[in-house]
């Protein structure tokens, strides 16, 4: 059964609130000009390199982008439920250097290739959201699928027959006097539609962080993303969890229960090994007795001769 709302998704809830609150703060404080990046003049000649670290942490500069970013973050809550809040927070923090530094650096490289037309990088956590979207695409299966069909014909009867032919598995067909197009969609299609709207909101500037975020997410999932330590995790106390014991059990009654189960299994293993060795000893003793009887029978026959 699907869980509604932001239940069991505290990190997603925090991300959603931060996205909206930071966007509102940019408007109230009138500091939108400090959030985005223009290669010229911000990076040079002004050398405002601090923007490389703050452009993604700031909110969005208009309400449309903030709305679609909040909707996308809400749809991505299922990733946190599937992973757990500790792994979810670890992913965001470990990919943050790449999603923050790669888009501005690529913008600097692409600017001369586009005849200095590509000069603007919109602010907002777009790259992080699309890195999470890559995990949503790869790890979350669809719940249901549906088809949307369109048809055109010259008469009502041909329209009816063409609509009936739209339900075949191939999704392609052509009636005697009508044509139709069938789109196969799923419950995840609305999430991709929201993401596409966000990526195209300030074309082409917003496309760059969206593409970089997707590539970073795919690289992280394929384990080709260079990270300082692949085993590093956010501390459990940082996300409200308890530290796991040496044997992977938590303290308290749960730990005692698992410890009792471990001791019982070890006792059963020892008993089974002892029984197996006892059976082997009994079998060897019985074979020795049979050998002695056979030798005794041979000696009796020799004496009789």
UniProtKB/Swiss-Prot annotation:
User: What is the topology of this protein in the membrane according to its UniProt annotation?
Assistant: Multi-pass membrane protein
Q: How does a null allele present?
A: Impairs growth on solid media under hypoxia and leads to triazole susceptibility. Impairs virulence in a murine model of invasive pulmonary aspergillosis (IPA).
- Transmembrane portions of the chain: 9-29, 52-72, 90-110
Q: Where is the composition biased (Low complexity)?
A: 152-162, 273-288
Which keywords, in A-to-Z order, does the entry hold? Endoplasmic reticulum, Membrane, Transferase, Transmembrane, Transmembrane helix, Ubl conjugation pathway
Highest taxon listed in the record's lineage: Eukaryota
The main location is endoplasmic reticulum
Q: What is its EC number?
A: 2.3.2.27
GO MF terms on file? Answer: serine-type endopeptidase activity; transferase activity
What chemistry does it catalyse, as a reaction equation? S-ubiquitinyl-[E2 ubiquitin-conjugating enzyme]-L-cysteine + [acceptor protein]-L-lysine = [E2 ubiquitin-conjugating enzyme]-L-cysteine + N(6)-ubiquitinyl-[acceptor protein]-L-lysine
Question: What are the GO cellular component annotations?
Answer: endoplasmic reticulum membrane
Q: Where is this region: Disordered?
A: 152-175, 273-305
What's its job?
Component of the DSC E3 ubiquitin ligase complex which is required for the srbA transcriptional activator proteolytic cleavage to release the soluble transcription factor from the membrane in low oxygen or sterol conditions. Required for growth during hypoxia and triazole drug susceptibility, as well as for virulence in a murine model of invasive pulmonary aspergillosis (IPA).
Would you tell me the protein name for this molecule? Answer: DSC E3 ubiquitin ligase complex subunit B
């Amino acid at each position: 059964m699907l869980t509604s709302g932001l239940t069991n998704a505290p990190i997603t809830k925090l991300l959603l609130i931060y996205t909206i609150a930071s966007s509102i703060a940019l408007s109230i404080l009138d500091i939108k000009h400090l959030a985005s990046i223009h290669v010229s003049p911000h990076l040079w000649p002004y050398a405002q390199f601090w923007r490389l670290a703050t452009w993604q942490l700031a909110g969005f500069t208009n309400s449309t982008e903030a709305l679609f970013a909040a909707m996308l973050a809400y749809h991505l809550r299922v990733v946190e439920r599937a992973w757990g809040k500790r792994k979810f927070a670890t992913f965001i923090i470990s990919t943050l250097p790449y999603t923050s530094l790669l888009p501005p650096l690529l913008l600097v490289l692409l600017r001369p290739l586009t005849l200095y037309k590509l000069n603007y990088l919109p602010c907002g956590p777009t790259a992080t959201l699309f890195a999470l979207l890559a995990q949503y695409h790869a790890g979350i299966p669809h719940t249901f699928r549906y088809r949307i069909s369109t048809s055109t014909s010259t008469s009502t009867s041909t329209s009816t027959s063409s609509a009936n032919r739209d339900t075949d598995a191939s999704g392609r067909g052509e009636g005697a006097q009508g044509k139709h197009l069938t789109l196969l969609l799923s419950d995840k299609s609305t999430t991709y539609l929201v993401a596409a709207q966000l990526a195209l909101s300030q074309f082409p500037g917003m496309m760059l962080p969206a593409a970089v975020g997707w590539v970073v997410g795919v690289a992280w999932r394929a384990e080709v993303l260079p990270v300082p330590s692949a085993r590093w995790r956010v501390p459990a106390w940082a996300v409200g969890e308890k530290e796991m014991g040496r044997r992977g059990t938590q303290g308290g009654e749960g730990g005692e229960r698992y410890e009792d189960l471990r001791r019982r299994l070890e006792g059963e293993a020892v008993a089974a090994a002892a029984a197996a060795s006892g059976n082997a000893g009994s079998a060897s003793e019985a074979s020795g007795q049979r050998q002695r009887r056979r030798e005794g029978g041979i000696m009796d026959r020799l004496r009789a001769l």
